[in-house]
C-alpha cells in the first residue's frame, strides 16, 4: 500500500481518541472483577439479561460514562473479526511503571514491556481473562495535521521499561518523577 493511499480526503469531522470499546465475555463477573480490581475501572451502569442476552456492564476510567462495556454470554472464540488489542493512555511515565507493578502484584502475566518502534510509546502489555491483548502506554508520538511520522531510522526499540529510559528516540525525554520506581522494577523481575 502506498503512503498517499493512507491519507484520505479531509472529512467534515475529526476522530480525537478512542471513545469506548465493547467486548464480549464468557464470564461477565470475572471480566468485571478484572477491569475493576486490576485496572481500577468503575462500574457506571448495568443491563440485566432481560435487556441484553448475557447482561452488559458499562465501566469508566474518567469522567466519560463508559470507556469500555462488557457483554456476557460469549461462546467459544470465533475465527476472524477478533479484537487485536486495546490501548489505554496514561498521563505520566510513572503510571506505566505503577501499572507494571500492579499487574505483577495481581499475578497478571506481562506479554511485553518497553518501547514500541512506530509511535515510540513506552508501554506494558498483558491479557485480560479471555485473552484480549491490552496495553497501558505513555509518550505516543504526537503529529500535526501535515507532519510526517518519525522516520524508521529514529526508532528505538526497548525490551524493558528500564531500557526505554536510557535509549530514547530524538525528542522524547522519558524521566520518572519517582526514581524509586526504577529500583522497584528491578527488584520485581521474574
Predicted regions and their residues:
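Vicinal oxygen chelate
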Residues: 1-11, 17-26, 77-102, 106-190
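Short beta-strand/turn micro-motifs at beta-sheet edges
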Residues: 7-10, 71-76
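Core segments of cupin and vicinal oxygen chelate
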Residues: 13, 24-67, 188
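Histidine-centered active-site/metal-ligand motif
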Residues: 20, 66-68, 84-85, 116-118
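Catalytic cores of nucleotide-enabled group-transfer and carboxylate-activating enzymes in metabolic
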Residues: 34, 44, 88-91, 98-100, ...
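A short beta-turn/loop motif at secondary-structure boundaries
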Residues: 49-52, 76-77, 115-119
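Conserved beta-strand in the GNAT
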Residues: 68-71, 135
Amino acid at each position: 500500500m502506498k503512503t498517499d493511499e493512507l491519507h484520505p480526503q479531509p472529512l467534515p469531522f475529526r476522530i480525537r481518541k478512542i471513545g469506548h470499546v465493547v467486548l464480549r465475555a464468557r464470564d461477565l463477573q470475572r471480566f468485571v472483577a478484572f477491569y475493576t480490581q486490576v485496572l481500577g475501572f468503575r462500574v457506571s451502569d448495568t443491563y440485566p439479561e432481560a435487556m441484553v442476552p448475557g447482561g452488559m456492564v458499562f465501566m469508566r476510567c474518567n469522567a466519560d460514562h463508559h470507556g469500555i462495556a462488557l457483554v456476557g454470554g460469549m461462546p467459544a472464540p470465533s475465527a476472524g473479526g477478533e479484537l487485536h488489542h486495546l490501548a489505554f493512555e496514561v498521563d505520566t511515565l510513572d503510571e506505566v511503571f505503577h501499572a507494571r507493578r500492579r499487574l505483577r502484584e495481581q499475578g497478571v502475566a506481562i506479554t511485553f514491556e518497553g518501547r514500541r518502534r512506530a509511535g515510540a510509546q513506552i508501554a506494558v502489555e498483558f491479557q485480560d481473562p479471555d485473552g484480549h491483548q491490552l496495553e497501558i502506554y505513555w509518550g505516543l508520538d504526537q503529529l500535526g495535521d501535515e507532519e510526517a511520522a518519525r522516520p524508521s531510522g529514529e526508532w528505538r526499540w526497548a525490551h524493558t521499561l528500564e531500557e526505554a529510559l536510557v535509549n530514547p528516540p530524538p525528542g522524547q525525554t522519558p524521566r520518572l518523577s519517582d526514581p524509586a520506581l526504577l529500583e522497584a522494577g528491578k527488584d520485581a523481575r521474574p
